[in-house]
C-alpha cells in the first residue's frame, strides 16, 4: 500500500483543514453547541459549494466521484476541527441511494443531496431494541403498491435538520420518508455530544409509495455500512490527533518545579501512548479506506478493524489529554471535554468496539485476512 497522499488528496486535506480552522474556531463551536439547531447553516452551504456533500457520490448523479480514501481524509479533518455538521448523516444517506436506489430515486433525491440542496439522514436503530447493527425491528406492512410504517427510530443523527430519512425495516429495505410527511414526529433526544444532535423519529401510519422504497436488499447496504464505519473512524482519529497536539503544546508550556511538565516521565510517557494510539488508528483507517477502493472483498474485515480501534482511540486519547492538562482540563471552559464527548458518542455509533472486535474474530477464525497490501 502506498501511504503518501497524492497531490489531489493533499489538496483536499489542506483545503479542508484551512476552511474548518477558519469556520469552526473554538468560540464558534461553543455557540453552535449552545444553539437550538446545533449546526451552522451558512457553514453547510459553504461545504456544499466545496463539493463535500457529494464528495464520494457518483459523478453521474452530481457527486465528485472520489473514493473512500478521500472521504477518510475529509472526515479526519472534520474530527480535528470538531465541526458541528450534518455531513456524516448526509453522506451515509447519499451512499445508500447510490448503492441501492433506482435511477428515478437517484435523480429525485441523490442529485439534490449531492449538491447540498437536500439533506438526508439514515434512520436505523429501533427504539427499545438491543441496538445490534444491521438488525431492524420496524415492520413495513403492505398497503396497495406501497407500505405503511409504524414504529419509532431512535438516535437518528441530524434528524431535526434533515429533509428526508432513509428508514430501515425488518426486511433490510430502506424507505424514503420526508420529515414533513403525515404521521412523522421528530423529537430531540439527550446526548453527551452537543456538537452532533440526535433525535427520535416516530412513524405513525406513514404511507410510503412504491416509488419511495429502494429496490436494494439488505446485503446491498453492507458497503454503505462499512464506509460509514471508516468515515466515523477517520473522524475519531482526527479527534485523537487534535487532543494529542493540545497536550503536547501544554506539556511544553506548563512549568512545574522549574521545568516543563513534559520533562517528567509521567507526562511524556502518557503523550507517547497517545501518539501510539492515534497513529495506529490512522493506519487502520486508511488501510480500510484503501480496501474500499482497491480491494472491496477485504473491506468488511478492514472496516471492523478500523472502527474497533478508533472507537477506543477516539475517547481514550482525549481522556489522557485531560489528565495531562490536570485541573484545567476538567473544566467547562477548556475545550477538551467536547472532544472526549464526541469520541465517546462516535464509539457507540455504527457498532461499538466490542461488536466490531467480534466481527474481526469471526473473520479471522473463518480464515479471512486483512487487505493484502496493508
Task: Describe each region flagged by the PLM.
Residues 51, 75-78, 171, 177-181, ...:
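Short Ser/Thr-interspersed hydrophobic loop/turn segments at strand-loop and sheet-helix junctions
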